[in-house]
Design a protein with these regions (language model features):
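Hydrophobic residues within beta-strands of alpha/beta enzymes
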Residues: 110-112, 144, 170-172, 240, ...
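A short acidic, helix-capping loop that chelates divalent metal ions and anchors anionic groups
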Residues: 116-121, 178-184, 248-254
């Protein structure tokens, strides 16, 4: 869920959006992460989407890598990533560069997210798989999570991507409730199509943990949120993240509401009652935030976790 805290917007944010900058050892890890990313000519969703958690996550030596280019073929009204109808072809060197960066950072778990590539016949699936395979070949003990596009509904491409690929978590974000999807997401996306991709992933690989994310504060109602939860559970989604939507700038979908931490807690409890194995819920939670910890929580016992960054 990409965000950008502009100077103008930052003065209007509630107090619970304060973020600490890294110091000491955390600052050194932040710099090392910066070097590993830049040194391997990689992109991260942390940077491209202006994530507010970048200092915390990079200060812990973790990052979410974004593959298949810096530009997305879709223009969603919530997202800061640049839109381009025909981006450059995926870099064939990227899979190895990704593996090198994961090795340099000493990661035990890597989250790989993607841009939409509607310009490619398979939606980018072959390149996404090459990236996963390269990391696994170099570092077979590293856990892998893929935050995937909807592949334009191409289930054959999804099968080619998932069959036999070394992966622990398959994630795809519905982003918002069904009613708001046409306002918030690119016209080529739909709530139903996202559900179909999540369902198909579970059918292809029943052992995979599936995950999705919803932004709050776009104008959704409580009933619509509950309906979205139920729809995700109906297709077998097990992990859920909930976070506050923050507009990247003028011209994007407006923020309709700042959701309080207490309401995030209440929604997490509701989600838990519906059967999600683990939930990360809080104003600054993003879909890949502390992903390894969320998976570990789900594998140990059902929990509800509110992950929030405050000063």
């Amino acid at each position: 869920m990409p965000v950008h805290l502009s100077t103008r917007a930052r003065t209007r944010l509630p107090e619970w959006f304060r973020v600490e900058l890294p110091t000491g050892a955390a600052l050194e890890r932040y710099r090392a992460t910066t070097g590993a990313v830049a040194g391997n000519a990689l992109h991260t969703v942390c940077e491209e989407a202006h994530c507010p958690n970048i200092h915390e996550c990079w200060g812990r030596g973790t990052a979410t890598f974004m593959v298949a280019g810096r530009e997305c073929t879709r223009g969603c009204r919530f997202c800061a990533v640049e839109t381009l109808r025909t981006p450059a072809a995926p870099d064939p060197a990227e899979p190895q560069q990704l593996a090198d960066a994961v090795a340099a950072m000493g990661l035990s778990y890597a989250v790989i997210t993607v841009v939409n590539r509607d310009d490619l016949p398979d939606g980018g699936a072959a390149h996404y798989r090459a990236c996963l395979d390269a990391v696994h070949a170099r570092l077979p003990d590293v856990g892998l999570e893929l935050l995937c596009s909807d592949l334009a509904g191409n289930e054959a491409a999804l099968a080619a991507l998932l069959n036999g690929v070394p992966l622990q978590v398959f994630a795809h974000n519905v982003e918002t409730v069904e009613r708001l999807t046409p306002e918030v997401r690119d016209p080529r996306a739909s709530f139903a199509q996202s559900l179909r991709i999540l369902a198909a992933a579970k059918e292809l690989r029943p052992e995979l943990v599936t995950k999705s994310s919803i932004m709050l504060g776009l104008g959704e109602t409580e009933a619509e949120i509950h309906d979205a939860f139920s729809a995700l559970r109906d297709v077998g989604v097990e992990l859920l993240t909930l976070g506050q939507y923050l507009a990247p700038g003028p011209g994007y979908h407006p923020v309709r509401e700042f959701v309080t931490p207490e309401r995030f807690d209440a929604l997490a409890r509701t989600a838990r009652e519906l059967g999600f194995r683990a939930i990360a819920s809080g104003p600054l939670v993003r879909s890949s935030y502390r992903a390894e910890s969320l998976l570990a929580a789900a594998q140990s016992e059902p929990v509800t976790a509110r992950l929030q960054v405050v000063a």
